[in-house]
Amino acid sequence: MKLESALGAHDVAITDVAAVLHTHCHIDHAGQDDRFPMTTPVVMNRRELEHSASGLMGGQYPPEYVKHHIDRLHAPGALRLLDLELSGPDEIFDGIVCEAAGGHTEGSMNILVETAAGTACICGDVIYDIQNQIVEPWHQALAFEPQTTGNHTMRKREEKAAMKRALNRDFVLPLHDFPARVEGGRVVARLKHEVPGPEFDVAEFAAEVATPVAAV
C-alpha cells in the first residue's frame, strides 16, 4: 500500500504528520522517510543510527535509507535522536514515551502509548510471533520463558530480557503479528486492528490465524 493511501485511510495527509517514530530502521520498517518534508522530524534512538551504518546487519539497512537519515542529521529539525540507554524513557508527546528496547538491534526502542485501557507497547521486532515465541514457545521448558529468533545482534539473554520487558505492559504490538493483551507477563487475549478493541480467545485465535500478517 502506498504511503498516501495508508495515511488517507485514516484521513491523514503526509503534511499532517507531526513526527515519524521508528522502533528501528530495518528495510521493512524505515522506508519512505524521504516522502516526508524535512520539517517533519524523524525520531529514533541515536544508537540505531550508529548501528545502521556499522555493517553488522548488512543489507537489512539499505544504503539509501542510511544516507537519507544522514542528510536529515544535517538539516535543522529534520531528525530527533534519543539517548535512551543513558537518559531512560523519553516522553515525545503527551502519552507517548520511548524507551530502549534492549533487543533485536542495538538501537531498537519500544514506543509506549497510553490508551483508555492501559499502556500499549509497540515493540518493533523484539517479538515476531506471539503464539510461537510467547504463548507456546518452541523448545522451552521453563515457565514464562520466551523463545528468541535468529535475527538479532544482541546476546540471547538480552533478547529474552527485551521480550519480557515488552510484555510488562497491558498490550503488546509486534510489527509482524497481531496485538495481544497481557496480564502479569502472560498473554490473556488477542486483538486484531484496534487497541483497545474486540478481544479473542488465545487458542481460537491461533487456530484461525495460522500465519501472522504484518500489522501497520
Q: Where in this protein do the model-derived segments appear?
A:
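Well-ordered beta-strand positions
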Residues: 19, 41-42, 171
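Active-site metal-binding loops of divalent metal-dependent hydrolases
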Residues: 25, 48, 103-105, 124-126, ...
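Short catalytic/ligand-binding loop motif for oxyanion handling, primarily in non-cytosolic enzymes
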Residues: 28-31, 51-53, 109, 130, ...
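Short, conserved loop/helix-junction motifs that constitute active-site signature segments
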Residues: 34-39, 167
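Catalytic core of the metallo-beta-lactamase
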Residues: 15, 31, 38, 75-134
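Metallo-beta-lactamase
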Residues: 1-12, 16-28, 46-100, 147-170, ...
